Amino acid sequence: MKIIAFHASRAAAPKRRRRRRRNYRPLLVLAIFLLIICAIGFAIHQVFSQTDTDENRYPITYVGSLPVHEHFVSEDAIGRPGGTREIEYVVIHETDNFAAGANAARHDAFIQENAKVEKLSWHYTVDDHEAYHHIPDNEPAYHAGDGMEPNGGNTSGIGVELCVAEDNDYEKTLQNGALLAGYLLWKYDLNMDALKKHQDFSGKICLEHLINEHRW
């Protein structure tokens, strides 16, 4: 009887151990889930928050593979109205400048000079390989043609200009613009309804390419 009891107890032991292991499984699953969430958060941070400095000493943020050069217009420029606002829209434009070499860097040089004396500004310019950031996202700018209308394109929208120069790859520019716009919608917790055309605020046929080709 003792031998039988001994074998019975040995046979029962693994079952008890298996039951104990099963009880730990929910904790193990939770730990793995938390590790995955942390990994995703770290990956998002790495993809959207990498910074560097270019040869002109402008800070660079990478939105995916797109380098975004931060070169803000002077705070005392007429084209930088200042103040902060609630961001409600991402407003897409085309530069309407078809001259060869009219890329994002050239438009950055243009806005730096012209915003000093004109009510003229927007937040980003994008071409087929890079982007420039001219006005902080949380400040209004003069890009939508609707003055300082409350909840309008200027007061509540981030203006993004897409380059259309003859030597610029427009399709690649569209891809880069979509990448930047998607990031801005994500960053400011906006839905797709917040993605607007310049035309939506002033009636101007802009973005001319996409509107005339019935792509938007």
Which functions belong to the PLM regions below?
Residues 5-6, 52-53, 71:
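Generic early N-terminus positional signal peaking at residue ~5-7
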Residues 2, 21-65, 84, 163-216:
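Basic/polar, cationic surfaces and motifs that engage anionic cell-wall
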Residues 56-188:
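Active-site-adjacent loop/helix surface patches within enzyme catalytic domains
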